[in-house]
């Protein structure tokens, strides 16, 4: 019974808060909530193997790292924005050097399979267009020794 009363209270409070808001204001509030939730998926700065400089939002910035026998996945950039203020296009420049093990830089969108951007020593440069919803760029490593320089604008 308490759960029902609590749920109804939230619905009523939410209704009063949104009363008088335009459709665009409601969508902007919703987008902000969704974006905040999407930031949780990113690997925390203290858990990253390298140094990350944030750009204008969670989708952009630079990341450089030297790895030594690292196994794991780092979600570096991205989020769950419905309407990204800076537009849907991201310019990606990446230099990957693999000394040992394997590493692949990937882009995952929604529930789609991850798209490998680069997985061999070399460079990658392209512009991708993000669909609405969750989009993340990361690196997946297995006993990886090497380095990465990643710049996203």
What residues fall within each predicted segment?
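Short, surface-exposed beta-strand/strand-loop-strand elements in extracellular ectodomains
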Residues: 100-116, 152-153
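A short beta-strand element within beta-rich, extracytoplasmic domains
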Residues: 88-98, 139
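Transition segment at domain starts
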Residues: 24-81, 115
């Amino acid at each position: 019974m308490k759960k029902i009363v609590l749920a109804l209270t939230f619905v009523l409070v939410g209704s009063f808060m949104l009363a008088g808001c335009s459709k665009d204001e409601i969508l902007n509030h919703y987008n902000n909530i969704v974006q905040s939730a999407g930031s949780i998926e990113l690997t925390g700065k203290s858990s990253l193997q390298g140094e990350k400089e944030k750009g204008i939002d969670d989708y952009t910035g630079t990341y450089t790292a030297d790895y030594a026998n690292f196994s794991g996945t780092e979600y570096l950039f991205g989020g769950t924005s419905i309407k990204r203020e800076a537009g849907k296009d991201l310019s990606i420049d990446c230099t990957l050097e693999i000394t040992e093990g394997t590493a692949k830089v990937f882009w995952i969108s929604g529930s789609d399979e991850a798209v490998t951007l680069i997985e061999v020593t070399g460079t990658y440069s392209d512009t991708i267009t993000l669909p609405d919803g969750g989009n993340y760029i990361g690196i997946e490593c297995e006993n990886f020794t090497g380095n990465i320089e990643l710049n996203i604008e």
